[in-house]
């Protein structure tokens, strides 16, 4: 449904403020917001995978809420930030192994935001589902985004609608239960329907 002027203006302002908060206060001072992961044994951990141009610091609030709910939460920073998606995947792979070793859990739940959801799918395509119980993606450009044309780096080009990388990934079947959370008014994944992932449980957030 179409948004009225007031709601659209509020949405744009809220996104702009969130952008400033993330890149001016959160990421540059990540260590203040995100101390080392607290990995205790006995529970299957959640591993948070950030999106394009970000770091693990963007998860500071969600991590607090998940830990308050009793979950064991891990995170990863994918760097350098603008290399190929395929070259970022081994960083996630190494982190999954480290988290499983630290917690004693044979598997993790992956939550990937934006590009992080694509990296998670790349991991599953390369390594299978032995270490992953389920996948949740948040506003991931599964079919690409026209906005990626103005981004920097090889990973941005690979996230462009219709890229060969995305076509290759689309040919890979989902091997774990997957939920794709999306928003019909996303200002970064355009067209917004490109957040849909065939084979996943599709949930549109208000």
Cite the ranges covered by each PLM segment.
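Flexible, membrane-associating and regulatory peripheral segments of lipid-active enzymes
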Residues: 1-46, 60
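Serine-dependent carboxylesterase/thioesterase catalytic core
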Residues: 48-52, 56-57, 61, 65-175, ...
């Amino acid at each position: 449904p179409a948004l009225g002027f007031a709601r659209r203006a509020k949405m744009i302002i809220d996104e702009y403020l969130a952008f400033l908060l993330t890149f001016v206060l959160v990421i540059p001072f990540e260590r203040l917001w995100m101390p080392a992961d607290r990995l205790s044994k006995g529970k299957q951990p959640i591993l948070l995978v950030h999106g394009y141009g970000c770091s693990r610091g963007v998860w500071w609030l969600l991590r607090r809420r998940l830990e308050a709910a009793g979950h064991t939460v891990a995170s990863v920073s994918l760097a350098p930030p603008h290399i190929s998606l395929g070259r970022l995947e081994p960083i996630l792979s190494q982190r999954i192994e480290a988290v499983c070793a630290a917690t004693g859990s044979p598997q993790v739940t992956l939550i990937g935001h934006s590009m992080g959801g694509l990296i998670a799918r790349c991991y599953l395509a390369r390594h299978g589902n032995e270490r992953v119980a389920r996948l949740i993606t948040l506003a991931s450009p599964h079919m690409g985004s026209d906005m990626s044309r103005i981004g920097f780096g090889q990973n941005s080009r690979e996230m462009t609608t219709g890229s060969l990388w995305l076509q290759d990934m689309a040919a890979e079947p989902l091997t774990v239960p997957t939920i794709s959370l999306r928003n019909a008014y996303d200002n970064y994944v355009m067209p917004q329907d490109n957040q849909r992932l065939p084979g996943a449980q599709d949930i549109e957030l208000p």
